[in-house]
Amino acid sequence: MKKRSFAIIALATLALSLTACGNGGSAAKTETAAAGEQAKAEVKEMKGDAIKKIVEDKKEKENYMIVDVRSPEEYAAGHINFAINMPIDTFKDNVSRIEDWKDKNVIVYCNSGKKSGEAADILASNGFTKVFNGEGVKKYSYDLKTFGNIRAKELMEKAKDALVVDAREAKDFEAGHFATAVNVNSEDPATIDAILPDDKNTLIITHCYSGNRSAKAAEYIASKGYTNVWNCLDGTKEVEYAFSKGDK
């Protein structure tokens, strides 16, 4: 009888152990799932005043990627300085375009904050850790720009078919530049006027060291009625371009 009792007790103990293990496994899965949910970054709101200060500070703006999620037409009509365009309709498919900013500050905005809120959630769900939903252009009076902004990959793809306006210092231009590039001084409009083509629809891309001088050149060119002007945000300080030396 004692042997039988011991056997029954042993089986009961084993059953309890298995049950505990089973519950522990479920608990572990629940904790893992919860941890995964917690890993999704919190989207923060950013007021127009704060964005204005960022884009007006040449050094501080280097710490932020600003993304306009409105339509290309709305973007072309006027957008926040240094903002690239990633329309909400195709936003999810183009997240890789700013993949290198996954652990840096990304501000998304639209007209009212609704579409940019959707975009912000998409970024957070894709592992972006510092996402801000910026105040919309219909809620804050921004100094909007009409020239576009692109990144290094787009510059390299389009350079051969564009008039590339290099706003770096002459010595750096002479050391190496894009084959289709011309050198200008962004502080001297006369040097820009001298290289502008007659066709106002010509694709013109400006670039420099960090996007500041080139933005000034792009704004001036756009003010002269040119309709296809783009500034590259990624300058030679951020990207090592495959330059060549030429006659220009």
Where are these regions (language model features)?
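Rhodanese-like catalytic fold shared by cysteine-dependent sulfurtransferases
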Residues: 2-9, 18-64, 72-105, 111-163, ...
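Phosphate-rich cofactor/ligand-interacting catalytic cores and adjacent structured alpha/beta frameworks
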Residues: 68
